[in-house]
Every structure is written in structure tokens, then in C-alpha cells.
Swiss-Prot record:
SUPFAM superfamilies: Ribulose-phoshate binding barrel (SSF51366). The keyword Hydrolase does not apply. InterPro entries: Aldolase_TIM (IPR013785), His_biosynth (IPR006062), HisA/PriA_Actinobacteria (IPR010188), Isoase_HisA-like (IPR044524), Isoase_HisA-like_bact (IPR023016), RibuloseP-bd_barrel (IPR011060). This is 1-(5-phosphoribosyl)-5-[(5-phosphoribosylamino)methylideneamino] imidazole-4-carboxamide isomerase. Pfam families: His_biosynth (PF00977). GO terms for biological process: L-histidine biosynthetic process; L-tryptophan biosynthetic process. It catalyses: 1-(5-phospho-beta-D-ribosyl)-5-[(5-phospho-beta-D-ribosylamino)methylideneamino]imidazole-4-carboxamide = 5-[(5-phospho-1-deoxy-D-ribulos-1-ylimino)methylamino]-1-(5-phospho-beta-D-ribosyl)imidazole-4-carboxamide. Signal peptide: none annotated. It is found in: Cytoplasm. Its EC number is 5.3.1.16. It comes from Cutibacterium acnes (strain DSM 16379 / KPA171202) (Propionibacterium acnes). Pathway: Amino-acid biosynthesis; L-histidine biosynthesis; L-histidine from 5-phospho-alpha-D-ribose 1-diphosphate: step 4/9. The lineage of its organism: Bacteria, Bacillati, Actinomycetota, Actinomycetes, Propionibacteriales.
Amino acid sequence: MTGELTLLPAVDVQGGRAVQLQQGVASSERAFGDPLDVAQKWQGLGAQWIHLVDLDAAFGHGSNTKIISSVVEQLDINVEVSGGIRDQRSLESALSAGATRVNIGTAALEDPQWCDEVVGRYGEQVAIGLDVRGDQLAARGWTREGGKVLDVLARLEDAGCRRYVVTDVASDGMLTGPNYELLGRICARTQGKVVASGGIAALEDLRRLRGLVPIGVEGAIVGTALYVGNFTLPAALDVCRAPIPADSSPMPPTD
């Protein structure tokens, strides 16, 4: 990835459909059609990455493995696969299907030894998902608490994790803006890169995130705002690729 802010349109799959949830609540879905059609639409509009999520696997209510694999195999761009990656078999299945990167969430909390081994072995092919509610991590599709985020982050730093996907659960799908304070806290405590997720509602949000590239924000996952038409993907990509304004200064670290 380059010095620009990398944009990852989200394609979340539940029950075989592309959906968007509010705050990760399974019953809050809005459907947007066939996942492959949606992913190919974003690819055709210029996306270089897709954030592809198996929500059923994340919630532990089945999986969409065949659909996920089909989408990965039929795209010509980078795909980050997330949802239900909790053991070696599911990790290798996603990578063998052609995923550029795999996002590990619950396993980072429930099986730290395996997670630390994976971080060391796979390097850039793995990101750790930090799904944050308050100062706690959320696990199992955001249905359980998983410990204090800064404690888990310290352990992952010791293991050499290179990238974190940081989601503010309260903002996700709500179009209320990213949690910039949370991003600042994480960036101040890691040598790795951070991909921001949750709450992006307008191009101005992307401009602000673009200004955080110098402190470690590498990318942004955008879902609902694209699906409901708050802005177009080409317009968003233009913002993410634009030079950082001269009067832009990174936020100070937050204790």
C-alpha cells in the first residue's frame, strides 16, 4: 500500500446476500443483492481492495464459505477476508482461495497462542481485528466481551502484529462519523498500521482520516455510506488519493 489512504468498500455476506448491519446487530440488516455483483460493481468503479465479511461465520450461525471463495476467485483486485477465521483450517482456506489478507478477530482473544504464531508466520497476510465497545473488545460477532483493548493490543505488539482493523462498534453502520479518539489511542500505542472501520458518513470523514496517515492510519473500510449513496466510490477514491493539506496536523496521542 502507498502513502495514500487505502479505501476498502465492505461487502458483508449474510444468508447468501450482501447486507449492511447497524452496530453489528444481526436483525438490523438491509439487503443489497448478490455479493459477487456488488463486489464487481466496486471493482468496476475503481476499488483496489474489497473488505469481504462472512457475517454468519462471525456470529457462529453457519457460513457462506462457497460464496466467499467464489467472490475472491472472480475478482482481479485485493481482497481482505474477515469473519469466522478462528483456526488454521479456516485461515488456510481463505488464503488458498486467493485472499490477499485475512482478518482475525475472535481467535485473537480466545486462542492467543495460535494467534501469536499466525502473526509471526504469515506477516502481511494477516490483520488483527480490534472490535471496540467503550474500552472493551467485542468477540463472537460482537456478542461477548473480550477484555480491555489496550491490554490485548500490548500483547499483540509483543507478538509483532503488523496491522490492525479497528472498528468502533457503536459507530458501525450508523453514519455518525469515525471514532477519531479511539484511532488516536491505538496509533499512539502500536508500530503497526491501522485500518479504520465504522461510522464513515461523508467525504469529510475520509479527508480527516487521510490526514491521519502520518500517525499510522493506512486505510478505511466504508460500507453503509456507499450503499445508501452518501457519496460515490470514485469521489471517495479521489479524496483518499489527494495530497494531505499543508495546514493538516495529526491529532495528538490520547491517554
